[in-house]
């Protein structure tokens, strides 16, 4: 069933393209399957976390730590060494100013970093959509599947080699819409120094 849904999503995103994506049908399908893989690994845990937050069993701080643990563990299952950090407009890396999230890779160590701008997140679905999108960028970046034509297009405000993760973002928002709710996240002040160790390759 997932395979059928993935193909349907790819057809929809091919017809209603979210940006200057030059990949063919199979390239977009591969990206869609990546989002499905992540959901298959993390979906149950994320749904339980969302339910706990929505029912006020946990607060925003517990939620963000729970999400960090789930995403970093799921990343390991996908062969990714992911660190999820929560920043704000003033502490986001300079080349990510204005972005909701970003994806960085340390090419020497393979470690990856996803900073989230908490000032731009107002709901659970926005947060999860952004995380799924940035992981899609990381996977494509590590595999060398980035669309340089998009990166060179100055009109799209992308600073790196963009894989156009909008379909992954939309996929996650739809998957988690049932238990969506507003959230006010705080930042990880002690994590800010991590960003200087990475270059934004993607």
Predicted regions, residues:
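Active-site scaffold of zinc-dependent metalloenzymes
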Residues: 85-128, 141, 157
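Post-HExxH zinc-binding segment in Zn-dependent metallohydrolases
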Residues: 143-182
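Auxiliary, metal-adjacent structural segments of Zn-dependent hydrolase domains
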Residues: 42-108
């Amino acid at each position: 069933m997932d395979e059928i849904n993935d193909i349907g999503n790819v057809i929809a995103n091919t017809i209603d393209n979210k940006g200057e994506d030059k990949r063919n049908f199979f390239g977009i399908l591969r990206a869609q399957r990546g989002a499905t893989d992540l959901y298959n690994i993390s979906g149950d845990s994320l749904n339980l976390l969302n339910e706990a937050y929505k029912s006020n069993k946990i607060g925003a701080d517990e939620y963000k730590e729970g999400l960090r643990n789930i995403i970093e563990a799921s990343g390991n299952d996908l062969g990714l060494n992911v660190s999820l950090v929560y920043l704000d407009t003033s502490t986001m890396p300079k080349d990510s100013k204005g972005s909701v999230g970003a994806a960085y890779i340390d090419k020497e160590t393979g470690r990856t970093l996803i900073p989230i701008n908490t000032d731009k997140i107002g709901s659970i679905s926005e947060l999860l959509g952004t995380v799924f999108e940035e992981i899609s960028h990381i996977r494509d970046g590590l595999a060398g599947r980035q669309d340089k034509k998009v990166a060179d297009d100055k009109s799209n405000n992308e600073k790196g080699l963009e894989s156009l993760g909008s379909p992954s973002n939309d996929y996650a928002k739809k998957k988690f819409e049932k238990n969506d709710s507003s959230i006010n996240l705080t930042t990880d002040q002690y994590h800010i120094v991590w960003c200087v160790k990475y270059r934004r390759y993607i």
